[in-house]
């Protein structure tokens, strides 16, 4: 009986790793969307994140909402999306302030946020945290940081 239970557990773990869509979230797709300017891709991923069962979904949803805010044309919608996204991401960081990936998401947004929204006070400390913890991050996040650092003023081609 114990053998059957262990086999079932291993099989379910394998299936969830082999198919990230089963868990409702694909990190590589998330980072692809964050680096694109495709509103449809952002919207699709937002729906996927909202439907996911991830504990971290608030951070991902917040980052996507703020990214979307920079892509829509109506001022009222921009402000609403940005505020909602900011609240979600900041709450996620507040709950887990050592989560380097969340801090990286905030850095992406802060580095490109208009000055008038006054969302740029953590850039230097976030950059330092990312540099210090880079090697401990999952490879998909490291690759996203590497790609972003080529365009970033504060991460400037972070070396692995």
Label for each model-derived stretch:
Residues 1-25:
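Bacterial Sec-dependent N-terminal signal peptides
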Residues 32-45, 78-86, 119-120:
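Helix-turn-helix repeat elements of alpha-solenoid scaffolds
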Residues 35, 67-76, 112-117:
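Short coil/turn linking the two alpha-helices of tandem helical-hairpin repeats
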Residues 80-87, 118-136:
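TPR/TPR-like (Sel1-like) alpha-helical repeat modules
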Residues 125-160:
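Terminal, low-structured helical/coil segments at or just beyond the last alpha-helical repeat
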């Amino acid at each position: 009986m114990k053998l059957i239970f262990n086999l079932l557990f291993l099989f379910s773990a394998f299936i969830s790793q082999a198919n990230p869509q089963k868990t409702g979230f694909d990190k590589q797709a998330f980072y692809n969307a964050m680096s694109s300017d495709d509103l449809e891709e952002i919207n699709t991923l937002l729906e996927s994140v909202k439907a996911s069962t991830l504990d971290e979904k608030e951070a991902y949803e917040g980052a996507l909402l703020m990214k979307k805010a920079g892509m829509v044309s109506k001022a009222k919608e921009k402000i609403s999306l940005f505020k909602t996204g900011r609240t979600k991401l900041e709450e996620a960081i507040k709950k887990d302030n050592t989560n380097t990936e969340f801090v990286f998401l905030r850095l992406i947004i802060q580095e490109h946020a208009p000055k008038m929204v006054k969302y740029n006070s953590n850039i230097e400390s976030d950059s330092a945290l990312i540099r210090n913890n880079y090697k401990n991050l999952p490879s998909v996040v490291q690759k996203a940081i590497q790609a972003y650092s080529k365009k970033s003023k504060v991460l400037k081609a972070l070396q692995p």
